[in-house]
Curated annotation (Swiss-Prot):
This is Endoribonuclease YbeY. PANTHER family: ENDORIBONUCLEASE YBEY, CHLOROPLASTIC. Single strand-specific metallo-endoribonuclease involved in late-stage 70S ribosome quality control and in maturation of the 3' terminus of the 16S rRNA. It is found in: Cytoplasm. PROSITE patterns: UPF0054. Its main location: cytoplasm. Binds 1 zinc ion. The gene is ybeY. Its cofactor is Zn(2+). It comes from Proteus mirabilis (strain HI4320). Keywords: Cytoplasm, Endonuclease, Hydrolase, Metal-binding, Nuclease, Ribosome biogenesis, rRNA processing, Zinc.
Length: 155
């Protein structure tokens, strides 16, 4: 049995066009059960100011970013389904979707799946890691009926 629990926090003034809680759960369920059958994830939707502050504090990057992933780290003897937190910047997602000629929904789905894979320990710093992670993202997104998010970059 698999179960995905979502704690959705909306900390942005403009909520128009945000995905529904059901959409977020669909995207989480597309990736998490195959890795961690019972998972609890917090998704916090923020504006550029909060994203910028967190990105500067935790990554040393002086700009807002699309998604930040904060894995929950419990002591080994504590078994909790808490996977971690995803902080997603609404404005950056919308801007990137436009720049990449994707629908906003498609890019939201990509950012949730991308962030979840980070929570699960995947990364894209090294080329081989990036290839593996991008392959998983593409496979999951295509199962959901979305295009390969890296198609533009590959052409």
């Amino acid at each position: 049995m698999s179960e995905v629990i979502l704690d959705l926090q909306v900390a942005t003034e403009n909520t128009q066009g945000l995905p529904s809680e059901a959409q977020f759960i669909t995207w989480l369920e597309a990736v998490l059960p195959q890795f961690q059958p019972i998972s609890e994830v917090t998704i916090r939707i923020v504006d550029e100011a909060e994203s910028h502050e967190l990105n500067l504090t935790y990554r040393g990057k002086d700009r807002p970013t699309n998604v930040l992933s904060f894995p929950f780290e419990a002591p080994p003897e504590v078994e909790l389904p808490l996977l971690g937190d995803l902080i997603i910047c609404r404005q950056v997602v919308e801007k990137e979707a436009d720049e990449q000629n994707k629908t906003v929904e498609e890019h939201w789905a990509h950012m949730v799946i991308h962030g979840c894979l980070h929570l699960l320990g995947y990364d894209h710093i090294e080329d081989d890691e990036a290839e593996e992670m991008e392959g998983l993202e593409t496979e999951i997104l295509q199962k959901l009926g979305y295009e390969d998010p890296y198609l533009i970059e590959k052409e």
